[in-house]
A protein has these predicted regions:
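Phosphate-binding/catalytic loop of phosphoryl-transfer enzymes
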Residues: 2-98
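ATP-binding/phosphotransfer module of carbohydrate and carboxylate kinases, centering on a glycine-rich
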Residues: 2, 19-27, 41-51, 88-184
């Protein structure tokens, strides 16, 4: 299992995996969560190269985030910077079920649309986006609500951080209908 706020793998205990891999391979090793590593890659050679203040938000099973301030990936004192999945979405009922990670899962949106549209494979994102792109009455409300939650997350990040650039990542980020609906 993992820690809700840091994503730390509790079963690893105090095992220093980076040192183990470094020693075995003779190569420099950095271990971080997927969103922070993707943000580092974008900062190094991608769409965040040369950007002073930016972020990468990953949409997948949960919602990840990497934050760049003054040209550097931020980690924070408790290594929780960018943990947007832990942000509360319902102030009247602040529980794990009302966090961005629980309410804005791209995987859950895909599953919900698949069930609503009676798509046999509930993980078939291609079939789901065919329904969405067709404007299917069963798919569209679920997809639109998901995009609204992503847009609200982006608005809140921008309001607090005044970023130069925000990137979206994750498997569904290449879908034109996703960006069009968020931009709407």
């Amino acid at each position: 299992s993992s820690d809700l706020f840091t994503g730390a793998l509790s079963f690893m205990g105090n095992f220093d995996l980076a040192s183990y891999i470094r020693q075995a391979s003779g190569c420099p090793v950095f271990i971080g969560n997927d969103a922070n590593c993707a943000t580092l890659a974008e900062l190094w050679q991608g769409r965040l190269k040369g950007v002073e203040n930016g972020a990468l938000i990953t949409l997948g099973t949960s919602v990840g985030g990497g934050l760049v301030l003054n040209g550097h990936l931020m980690s924070g004192r408790h290594f929780q910077t960018g943990q947007v999945s832990a942000m509360v979405t319902n102030f009247d009922e602040p529980t794990p079920a009302t966090t961005v990670g629980a309410t804005t899962s791209a995987v859950k949106m895909i599953e919900d649309v698949a069930v609503a549209c009676k798509i046999k494979d509930t993980h078939d994102g291609w079939a789901v986006f065919e329904k969405i792109d067709e404007g299917d009455d069963r798919a569209w409300p679920i997809f639109s609500a998901f995009c609204r939650r992503v847009a609200l997350l982006l608005i809140n990040l921008q309001a607090v951080l005044d970023l130069d650039r925000v990137l979206l990542g994750g498997g569904i980020s290449s879908q034109p209908s996703l960006l069009a609906e968020i931009d709407y």
